[in-house]
């Protein structure tokens, strides 16, 4: 059983009057995140590459488009505070990537970064988007880099959040271990206790309001995390699921403006690795956001916006 509301067909569902939206606005007010009361907010589905994808649409379609790609084990809702703030100036599309959130799980368990990058390419075509900015966090950052390498003509600019061609093994191991230890729960409070212990940057109440987007309830009453765990398996032909991620030598050829955003206390993207990344790419700049770890946009939303908005506004 799903715990959150979303469109169950190809007709958009207006979420602007839903209690979930009221809860989000309450979180934004408590965190000092400004937003426009009139910003449009809808849940939508599309079918691309023979698979149903769910996404959240914010703002006016006549505004510049920003595509948001979430990290591993997360969903489009991980961007809600960011989307709410930006909706007055941008047409924001936050995609639930394959096997995540409210999108369909892939029948063949094909979850390489190359697969996901091709999904985004087809999503851009299906929505008729012209030169969007693509912003990806963690896994979504890898997808953004892969798309930038394969189809640089599709995007106006890219924002990479706490990810790069070099990552710290300790940081990625900590994430894998947390995910591996937290699969099913007797009740939502059990999951909440574990997330609060793991993520010291967000308040318990803020985390509580987002739980419904990360869990589903099975027929036996257990709560389980809402993503396809098969994606951790090795894909066909012996290719690891990270197949398709470009290296520094390939990224050096990227023609579009690139912003790298690092969490100041991140254990995934070290300061040295971030510096090597931007030094290798002539079009890249680096912004470090204090008081947050790997999940920059949710752990310090105001700081993330301070880093990203000037970059977006400067694109013209």
Over which residues does each language-model region extend?
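Alpha/beta-hydrolase fold catalytic core
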Residues: 1-64, 88-90, 129-130, 309-316
């Amino acid at each position: 059983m799903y715990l959150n509301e979303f469109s169950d067909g190809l007709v958009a569902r207006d979420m602007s009057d839903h209690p979930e939206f009221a809860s989000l606005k309450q979180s934004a007010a408590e965190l000092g995140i400004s937003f426009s009361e009139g910003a449009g907010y809808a849940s939508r589905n599309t079918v691309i590459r023979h698979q149903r994808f769910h996404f959240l649409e914010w703002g006016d379609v006549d505004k510049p488009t920003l595509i948001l790609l979430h990290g591993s084990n997360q969903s489009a809702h991980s961007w809600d505070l960011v989307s709410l703030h930006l909706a007055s100036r941008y047409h924001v599309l936050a995609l639930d990537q394959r096997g995540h959130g409210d999108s369909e799980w892939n029948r063949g368990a094909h979850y390489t970064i190359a697969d996901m990058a091709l999904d985004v390419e087809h999503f851009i075509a299906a929505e008729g988007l012209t030169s969007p900015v693509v912003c990806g966090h963690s896994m979504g950052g890898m997808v953004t880099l892969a798309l930038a390498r394969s189809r640089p003509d599709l995007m106006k600019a890219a924002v990479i959040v706490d990810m790069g061609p070099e990552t710290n093994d300790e940081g990625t191991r900590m994430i894998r271990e947390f995910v591996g230890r937290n699969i099913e729960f007797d009740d939502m409070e059990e999951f909440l206790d574990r997330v609060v212990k793991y993520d010291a940057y967000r308040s318990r109440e803020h985390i509580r309001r987002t739980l419904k987007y990360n869990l589903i309830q099975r027929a036996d009453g257990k709560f389980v995390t809402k993503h396809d765990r098969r994606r951790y398996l090795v894909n066909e032909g012996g290719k690891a699921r990270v197949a398709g991620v470009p290296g520094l030598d390939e990224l050096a050829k990227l023609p579009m403006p690139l912003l790298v955003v690092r969490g100041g206390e991140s254990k995934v993207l070290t300061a040295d690795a971030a510096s090597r990344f931007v030094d290798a790419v002539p079009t890249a700049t680096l912004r470090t956001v204090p008081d947050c770890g790997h999940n920059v946009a949710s752990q310090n939303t105001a700081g993330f916006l301070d880093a990203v908005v000037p970059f977006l506004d400067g694109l013209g």
